[in-house]
Amino acid sequence: MKSAKVLPLIAVTLSASLFLAAGSQKAAAGPAAGKLNVKIMEWDVPTAKARPHDPAVGRDGALWFTEQLANKLGRLDPATGAIREFPLKTPNSGPHGLVADRDGNIWYTGNYAGLIGKLDPRTGAVTEYKMPDPLASDPHTPVFDVQGILWFTVQGGNMVGRLDPHSGKIELQKVATKDALPYGMGINSKGIPFFCEFGTNKMAKIDPKTMEIIEFTLPEGTRPRRMVIAPDDKVYFTDFEQGHLGRLDPVTGVVKMWPSPGGPNSSPYGMTITPDGMVWYSEAGVNPNTIVRFDPRTESFSEAKIPSGGGVVRNMAATSDGRIYIACSGVNKIGLVETNAKPQAQVRAGHSSQLSN
């Protein structure tokens, strides 16, 4: 296995509104946003204080979610509102990210227990795969590639890994940048995994054959947390620290940043992309949390408030018909956003619920 290399690309473009004096930047408001015409429905998680963390789309269209503090996975039937919970194997495993495979199994990261698990929804049986390195104690965001290989980030362990579901073999690669905190992840049209380095101002990609890591430098102070990949393979990410939406062109290294409507303290977090190419994310630093839609064609924003307040939407997942699933951690709810999105192109969503495998 090749060792990781750092080949930062630093071409950067910033929208004019980012050039603010240091004394005025903190108080600056974000750009004006239009009213977002969506319907948001929410359901209570049956187990109290479960902390629903990530949502995912099941093969049958159901809303799956992790219950990080209850050690369960949950399934919502959006048509009936019925919720079923599935207890997991290892106590206090801290289920975090999750994703469905082509057979309908639900794979999740055991963020507190150094493992990846697979739930068979038909039987409730759980199969676990322990990390081969004790330093890889907190697997984070999982995503399948088109070959059916499960890729994942390891946040505190500062690694990226791959798991072959057929053999159970796990390979890990260390990120060269110290304390990079690998976070959100996605796969582009060429099968190349990209990921956020939340501990620094970088994005990165990993070669699926050699495991070589190449990093892309973002503007100073940026902290990318979640990401999605558009049909043109440009990478959109939320800048949690400074309140921006960002876009990286991996071919040229050019980065463009837009201030989020909620301003520099809006803490953009969970995100997804719908089949019409619209980028969606939530602002966790405003109360109530917002659902924000960004139109890449017009570079315009629209927003709506989450009825329950949201309590921090840590991730989002888009269905094939343009609906959005959300998990509202702090208020112990899961939600559905009806967007009326119309497909225009095949979209590769770089979140934990993508079904491209």
Spans of model-derived segments:
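Blade-level signature of beta-propeller repeat domains, shared across WD40, Kelch, NHL, RCC1
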Residues: G311-N357
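A short beta-strand motif characteristic of beta-propeller blades
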Residues: M41-V45, R84-P87, T127-M131, K169-V175, ...
